[in-house]
Amino acid sequence: MGRIDITILGSGSAVPSLHRWHPSILVKDWMGNTVLLDAGEGVQIRLRKVGVSPSSIDVLAITHPHGDHINGVAGLLMTMSLQSRRKPLTIISTSESLEFISETLEATRENLGFEVMLVDARESGVLDVGRPSGDRLTIEWERACHNIESLAFKLVWTLRPRIDARILERLDLKAGPWIRELIEKGRAHVEGRIVTLKDISASGERKYSVAYTGDTSPCTRVAKFLHGSDILIHDSTLDSSLAREAAERGHSTSLDAARNALTSGAKLLILFHVSSRYSGYEARLLLKEARRVFPNTVLSWDGMKLSITI
């Protein structure tokens, strides 16, 4: 088993409020991988508030270059530099976002002291997040349906088959150094024979995924990409009475989010990117609306934490 921790650093939209800052989501897993989805203004303050060092981030995935999703990147990189970061950082985003980041660094003449690997996500794609383990994390992306080029992301964990002690006993095999080789390579030489993970596992490979739409209006491409997600973090800027306005601005309503959660087969829907016009208790309108279609829905708030054991 493994554990995934999701922390909502900022749950708001274009206009921040005292209670909802610009969008940003931190995802950490049991292998030590740390991914930051979007980096709104003030993200490094939010990281400090939850006790996470910016230098622990391995991958920064930016959906698009609108200010509420990207304005925190420059300060974040500079803080990493001041913390003497040395390990490389991967940034995945659209070409416009990467150009914005590069030009900002050039304008400030910052010498970061660590390598920044830019991944230009022009079309759909996949990135392996590298840490040595039998389990694996990959990040997938697809173009969203916003008013500028934007991305939706999906974090997919592939869990290797788990070794069953009862099968080891039945095969008269004793645990030893060969177990590590087996986990890393899928097979090992043991007492004159080749043993595979399949031979000593009660179940096969499993997958678990967390999808994040970024800013998007409902469309077939995004719905298809979200299919099979276990947790769905979905744009829910407005309620359904403002569906026309949401569509014109390239956003979704809470009802749109619920419908996508239902068709995707998700187990949990998290409403995200909430407009500042819903202050305090008024935001519950979004939750009430979504739950009529998809009951297992929660409304995100700044500082919200979710831990999942898979």
Curated annotation (Swiss-Prot):
The active site is at D68. Disulfide bonds: none annotated. Binds 2 Zn(2+) ions. The keyword RNA-binding does not apply. Homodimer. Zinc phosphodiesterase, which displays some tRNA 3'-processing endonuclease activity. Probably involved in tRNA maturation, by removing a 3'-trailer from precursor tRNA. This is Ribonuclease Z.
